[in-house]
Amino acid sequence: MTVVVSDHQNPRPPGDDAAPLGRTGNRDRPPGSFFGRRKGHRLRPHQNDLVAQLLPRLGFDPARIGPSGPAALFDPPVDETRIEIGFGGGEHLVAEALAFPRAGFIGCEPYVNGMAKILVQIEAHAIRNIRLFAGDASQLLACLPPASLARIDLIHPDPWPKRRHWKRRFVQDATVAEMARVLRPEGEFRFVSDIDDYCAWTLTHLARSPDFLWLAERSADWQDPWSGYTMTRYGRKAMREGRRAAYLRFRRERTAV
């Protein structure tokens, strides 16, 4: 990983040369858009049963979230709500839910196989503080009231490496603004990727937002996982293949509007 960081407060991210922006003619992700496959390998019989029976109980319609916010989705009540966007096999999300039983977690994953995998883990651990949304995360964020989330995690997202596909990346000016709206003051957006270009892209987009501060004072702050981080299967594969990830944390500033 070659992201350049200076060892001082609020280091500057790479410039536009590292991540050219706005040259596709579409800066912002189209609302309600999803790009990619929704189903891959055939599900096992028990996974099919869980998708048919358990997923409807844990799923919800974002349009029905009222002024009380996503915390109302959970019973027993929770102290705060966090979201993980594109949770893959669910390793990180499940570990977080088990480690923080007083927090509510929403997992967004349109990929059916990912949903099936996490449902198996939810059943095995009798987890009660996870809710699932099998759609586009930008649609969910648009339905949330202001300052209703404590954290948003985006871990090893699809980098869409081809230039003509950059508009499909989740991190866009519009989604950064939406995250600032739904995160409470001092809330965090956390991003993990082993793709240099997407890390530079994310740093550049967040740096030009007045609503976020990059929480890195030294190189170790982004080169090493934060405390308690659970490595995903993809993350372990990247390490085996010699690719080093960056772990970026951004705080939602109190001056955001």
UniProtKB/Swiss-Prot annotation:
Disulfides per UniProt: none
Residues annotated as catalytic: D158
Keyword Signal tagged: no
Sequence positions that bind S-adenosyl-L-methionine: E84, E109, D136, D158
Keywords of this entry: Methyltransferase, S-adenosyl-L-methionine, Transferase, tRNA processing
Region feature Disordered, mapped onto this chain: 1-42
Function noted in UniProt: Catalyzes the formation of N(7)-methylguanine at position 46 (m7G46) in tRNA.
Xref: PANTHER family: 3-DEOXY-D-MANNO-OCTULOSONIC-ACID TRANSFERASE/TRNA GUANINE-N 7 - -METHYLTRANSFERASE, PENTACOTRIPEPTIDE-REPEAT REGION OF PRORP DOMAIN-CONTAINING PROTEIN
Designated name of the protein: tRNA (guanine-N(7)-)-methyltransferase
Name of encoding gene: trmB
